[in-house]
Amino acid sequence: MSVLKILKYPDDRLRIIAKPISKIDTKIHNIIINMFDTMYYENGIGLAATQVNIPLQIIVIDKIEELNHPLVLINPKITKRSGLTSIQEGCLSIPNYQAEISRSKKITVTALNYFGKRIKLKTSSTLSICIQHEIDHLIGKLLIDYLSNLTNLKLLKKNK
């Protein structure tokens, strides 16, 4: 299909809160396919629709050990969290930058899949971190929001 343009920090459109999807149709399927094409092209493991200027609640994830197939989450909601873990995270919207972020170690998430079927996923480790990171994008939150104001200011100056 096609590779979409990824919004880069400090673009204000990254702060837009995504809207839930009420109907999964060909238009939504095409968005999902283009999101996977974009994520693979950029060598990412996850991508939220808001990162490609589409304000809809869609996440795509792949290339993670726990997955044996690409994962699509539409209207995802974390329903349970437990434990804490920290890991170095990167973001396609903040190129060449990584930071250690503390997140829930285990989560349970409900969502619709590519076909509109309701799914419930219990996960931990890298997949858990990736899902939390991408859901943050859907609510206008970036990994830098977990960092100090001084670190944010330095990154903002670097990316302008």
Curated annotation (Swiss-Prot):
Superkingdom of origin organism: Bacteria
Residues that coordinate or bind Fe cation: C91, H133, H137
Catalytic activity: N-terminal N-formyl-L-methionyl-[peptide] + H2O = N-terminal L-methionyl-[peptide] + formate
Residues at the catalytic site: E134
One GO MF term: metal ion binding
Gene3D superfamilies: Peptide deformylase
InterPro entries from the UniProt entry: Peptide_deformylase, Peptide_deformylase_sf
This protein's record includes keyword Protein biosynthesis: yes
Family: Belongs to the polypeptide deformylase family.
Protein name: Peptide deformylase
